[in-house]
């Protein structure tokens, strides 16, 4: 796929843009030959670009993107080089405001586009957040690996009366708290707990049982979680913390493990859950 073809693709996908987040180019999906290491996102007036591997024609690509925003709604470009140590980000065109947030189905989530690694928002779980919003009315929700708590916001907007957010990162939970206030949500029943999930099930169980459980871990986090050996530990605890009619949203962002990995764990360790 040529760089000119990418530009045409971006223009086609930009015709119906609003202030809501939209992925304009998803090279990571493996559908565009030669560009599996490129993603381009629209965040209101910001064009957010990520490179997962060094590109020989990077300067030509960036030149095309600068041409593209001349006729799009974007006024700035942020580039993240995820292949470099620390995954540094920089503003290469224009300026970005001090406070940036993404909009998803009317829900606001605070972003840090210049942070290392992750910005605070994972667009691939949009459909998951829609599911939670549609299925959380009058439910007690457990949000494991909550990070900046987007699932919690979706649950409260959907009518959950209680949400317990569990994550090791106090900083992420603090941002999650801010995200709730950003959406003008009632905080009664919303809690934030900086627990090591694998070591804290007695405390998690004490706050149950739960009517909706969300598991959205990293594939690998040094010293705290490794999907291939630790996911089963969480699945095995589900019968102890789930209500009789509990819904489970089990997620895993791994290029090496497919849905059968999770299905088999549930079949073996929590057979009361049915697909």
Where do the PLM segments sit?
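C-terminal substrate-binding/active-site "lid" region of AdoMet-derived donor-dependent transferases
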Residues: 229-275
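S-adenosyl-L-methionine
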Residues: 168-214, 223
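Conserved SAM-binding motif I beta-strand of class I
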Residues: 162-167
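Conserved class I S-adenosyl-L-methionine
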Residues: 138-147
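Non-catalytic substrate-recognition/targeting regions of SAM-dependent transferases
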Residues: 31-34, 38-41, 57-122, 130
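Short strand-turn motif at the edge of the Rossmann-like AdoMet-binding core
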Residues: 217-218, 224, 251-255
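Conserved SAM-binding loop of SAM-dependent methyltransferases across substrates and taxa
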Residues: 148-160
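Non-catalytic accessory regions of SAM-dependent methyltransferases
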Residues: 1-44
